[in-house]
């Protein structure tokens, strides 16, 4: 859906939620948007800037650590009334693991790094396209689940599609 590149400070977080607000249908009281994140307070500050609090469910998964090793997690409701069993960040953690496995600049403690934010954004756009339109789980891509396409695409489909539009 969206990503933001940079140090995880308030400006970067605001940029992320602004993109989400632009790319999604604005939620309503009866059709709320759900957010689940880790315990960073920047998320708590950014969400109300771009979404009406009455239209949001927001929960946090906070990892309990000892010496950088996760020993447990606990969940908390921050905004709205999201059910505890729906508060999860597994998809984000899985996507981050996928990034680290495929791109050297995302590996922790690496010598290989991207020198410019633009390069990281470009790499993330490619990875996001691959994730959303090409890779499938149970014969469905995320784009198919959202009704954006009816079939699994290939890079050939993406790069060689003839686009038509009026100027």
Spans of features found by a protein language model:
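Residue-level recognition of single "structural anchor" positions
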Residues: 1-167
């Amino acid at each position: 859906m969206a990503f933001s590149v940079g140090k995880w400070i308030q400006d970067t977080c605001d940029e992320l939620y602004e993109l989400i607000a632009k790319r999604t249908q604005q939620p309503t009281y009866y059709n709320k948007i759900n957010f689940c994140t880790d315990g960073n307070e920047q998320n708590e500050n950014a969400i109300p800037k771009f979404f009406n609090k009455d239209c949001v469910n927001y929960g946090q998964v906070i990892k309990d650590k000892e010496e950088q090793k996760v020993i447990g997690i606990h969940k908390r409701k921050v905004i709205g009334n999201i059910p505890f069993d729906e508060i999860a960040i597994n998809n984000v953690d899985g996507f981050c693991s996928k990034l680290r496995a495929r791109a050297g600049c995302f590996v922790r403690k690496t010598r290989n790094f991207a020198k410019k934010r633009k390069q990281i954004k470009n790499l993330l756009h490619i990875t996001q396209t691959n994730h959303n339109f090409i890779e499938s789980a149970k014969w469905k891509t995320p784009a198919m689940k959202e009704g954006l396409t009816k079939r699994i695409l290939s890079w050939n489909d993406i790069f060689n599609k003839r686009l038509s539009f009026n100027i």
